[in-house]
A protein has these predicted regions:
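Alpha-helical transmembrane segments and their juxtamembrane interfaces
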Residues: 12-13, 50, 118
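Bacterial N-terminal signal peptides
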Residues: 7-15
Length: 133
């Protein structure tokens, strides 16, 4: 019984640590989406992790990838946060984004903590769940 209690207490503490970061993570994602909506790819690029910045090399290349590969992120009609979870030490924030055509998309934003704060280290479109608005 004592081991169970210690395990539960540890789980609650760890969960609190993960979800204590949620507001900051949401702020980073919101700021990047706002930059995309303003076509400010230079600002949007600053919210990407150093490894993502290294892959794309410039805000212009990054912007092209987003507008062509993730148009729902570039011009969302609606954004809903579905939950933050820890996937083996990597924090993943799930979002439901409705595009300009009214189609809903579920995406996972993978986050990494740097000296400058939280950065987006990748975005993955979750398998189509047939969502509409």
């Amino acid at each position: 019984m004592r081991k169970w209690f210690i395990g539960m207490a540890l789980s609650v503490c760890l969960a609190g640590a993960v979800f204590g970061q949620e507001a900051e993570i949401k702020g980073v994602i919101n700021s990047q989406i706002e930059a995309f909506q303003a076509d400010d790819f230079a600002s949007a690029f600053t919210y990407a992790s150093p490894s993502i910045q290294g892959i794309f090399g410039s805000p212009e290349n990054f912007g092209r990838m987003v507008t062509q590969g993730f148009p729902m992120v570039w011009r969302p009609a609606d954004v809903e946060y579905l939950g933050l979870r820890d996937e083996g030490g990597v924090l993943a924030q799930r979002l439901r984004i409705v595009d300009q055509s009214g189609r809903a998309h579920v995406l996972d934003y993978f986050m990494t903590e740097t000296r400058e704060g939280w950065k987006i280290n990748g975005v993955q479109l979750v398998k189509d769940q047939g969502l509409t608005t």
